[in-house]
């Protein structure tokens, strides 16, 4: 079945195979999934087990077709199964899956990243965004000789113990303030501040400035929903950290090479000392990177004393996928991403306004979010204050009509360049039903 010949429109009873697979998964995997947000915990119902993707569409195990607004949580800017990426993966895999030695592709991918992001002078490849942020923080501590790290509430930097306090993404979806298993000692040197609050940063540096190794921030927040940095926020972080001798770590795992060819740096031009990347640069395979100033990066082993390693880092197949994905992302692709995000936002706003549903359609570049709120959302407290109980019926009304949005009120929506008029027609047809469902939702406990 091709994108031009869709499967039947999903409905609540149309996913028996997914239900069967989920029951099997529950017996062998905690919660039935390998990443919590996939479990539909906050929206209820049966997670869809996807078996195929093409362009802007996904097909589940019951052969239902969906317009995909998750894009594998970001990597698929060119759409699923892009011919250039598939060709590169096949060619690389035919030559061998892993060697445990240096490879030519590692050099090419690192050079591509360096060419795109001006402040990045050297790159180290790793296997996941979590490894990238963990390694960047370790390197910042090793370079500065300091211990404390400043992060922002609602920003998610992978499941690094010291950075899970007041985190976004799956932690926010599950409503956890942090997570069991992270000890007080592991988080003792982590300072959590409100996002977009430079005054709080200044006060913290006034008290602890000579103890702070780095500030780590999402270049634009996407893990509590899409929240752009306030004008001057990233620039203010740059000034404060530079004055105090601390490093600025820009987490661009989500925004990198998605919101522009140079990531968020291509939008605001604020230079970090270190960067973390993933998602788009992986092409959908397990790969990530961190990089930055050469004098900082050269502190890594074997050049320097800060240890970091990975058996599968620089895997030739993953590197080939990432390089092909980046090279397929032409200026026309980035123009399409921006255009598609704007079009999606207009459809969301129009449908919700027609039903009188309190909402904010928010953008961080071409990341999109819907907050069920009367007021603009600029930080984690604002995201948490939304009427998130409206989201589950909104989500399921879309899912039942062949639209696959993120299954959480605290995640960004990801467009791709393969979206066409047919995809937007399907979204436009489904959204009025979803808006009505959101309008009819009642707050748990209301009237009790």
UniProtKB/Swiss-Prot annotation:
Keywords of the record: Cytoplasm, Isomerase, Porphyrin biosynthesis, Pyridoxal phosphate
Compartment(s): Cytoplasm
Superkingdom as given in the UniProt entry: Bacteria
Any one GO cellular component localisation term in the record: cytoplasm
Main subcellular location of this protein, as a coarse class: cytoplasm
Pathway(s) per entry: Porphyrin-containing compound metabolism; protoporphyrin-IX biosynthesis; 5-aminolevulinate from L-glutamyl-tRNA(Glu): step 2/2
Keyword Cytoplasm on entry: yes
PROSITE patterns: AA_TRANSFER_CLASS_3
One BP term from GO: protoporphyrinogen IX biosynthetic process
Gene Ontology molecular-function annotations: glutamate-1-semialdehyde 2,1-aminomutase activity; pyridoxal phosphate binding; transaminase activity
Keyword Transferase: no
Family, per entry: Belongs to the class-III pyridoxal-phosphate-dependent aminotransferase family. HemL subfamily.
Subunit: Homodimer.
Record's protein name: Glutamate-1-semialdehyde 2,1-aminomutase
Source organism (scientific name): Saccharopolyspora erythraea (strain ATCC 11635 / DSM 40517 / JCM 4748 / NBRC 13426 / NCIMB 8594 / NRRL 2338)
């Amino acid at each position: 079945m091709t994108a031009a010949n869709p499967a039947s429109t999903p409905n609540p009873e149309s996913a028996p195979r997914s239900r069967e697979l989920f029951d099997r998964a529950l017996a062998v995997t905690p919660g039935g999934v390998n990443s919590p947000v996939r479990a539909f915990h906050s929206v209820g119902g049966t997670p869809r087990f996807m078996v195929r993707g093409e362009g802007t569409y996904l097909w589940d195990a019951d052969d239902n077709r969906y317009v995909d607004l998750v894009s594998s949580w970001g990597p698929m800017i060119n759409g699923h199964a892009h011919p250039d990426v598939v060709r590169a993966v096949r060619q690389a895999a035919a030559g061998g899956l892993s060697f445990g030695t240096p490879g030519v592709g590692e050099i090419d991918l690192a050079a591509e990243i360096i060419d795109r992001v001006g402040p990045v002078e050297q790159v180290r490849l790793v296997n996941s965004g979590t490894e990238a942020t963990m390694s960047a923080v370790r390197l910042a501590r090793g370079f500065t000789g300091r211990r404390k790290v400043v992060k922002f509430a609602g920003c998610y930097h992978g499941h690094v113990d010291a950075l899970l306090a007041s985190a976004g993404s799956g932690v926010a979806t599950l409503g956890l303030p942090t997570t069991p298993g992270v000890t007080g000692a592991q988080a003792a040197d982590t300072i959590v501040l409100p996002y977009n609050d430079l005054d709080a940063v200044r006060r913290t540096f006034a008290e602890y400035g000579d103890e702070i190794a780095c500030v780590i921030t999402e270049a634009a927040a996407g893990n509590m929903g899409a929240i752009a940095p306030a004008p001057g926020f990233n620039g203010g972080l740059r000034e404060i950290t530079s004055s105090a001798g601390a490093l600025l770590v820009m987490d661009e795992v989500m925004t990198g090479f998605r919101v522009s060819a140079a990531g968020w740096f291509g939008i605001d031009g604020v230079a970090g000392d270190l960067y973390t990347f993933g998602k788009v640069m992986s092409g959908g395979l397990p790969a990530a990177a961190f990089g930055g100033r050469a004098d900082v990066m050269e502190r890594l082993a074997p050049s320097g004393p800060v240890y970091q390693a990975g058996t599968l880092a620089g895997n030739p197949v993953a590197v080939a996928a990432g390089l092909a994905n980046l090279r397929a992302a032409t200026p026309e692709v980035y123009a399409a991403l921006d255009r598609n995000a704007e079009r999606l936002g207009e459809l969301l706003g129009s449908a919700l306004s027609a039903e009188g549903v309190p909402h904010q359609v928010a953008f961080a570049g071409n990341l999109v979010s819907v907050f069920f709120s009367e007021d603009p959302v600029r930080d984690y407290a604002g995201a948490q204050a939304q009427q998130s109980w409206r989201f589950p019926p909104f989500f399921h009304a879309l899912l039942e009509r062949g639209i696959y949005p993120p299954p959480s009120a605290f995640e960004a929506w990801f467009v791709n360049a393969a979206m066409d008029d047919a995809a937007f027609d399907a979204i436009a047809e489904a959204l009025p039903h979803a808006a009505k469902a959101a309008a009819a939702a009642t707050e748990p406990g209301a009237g009790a």
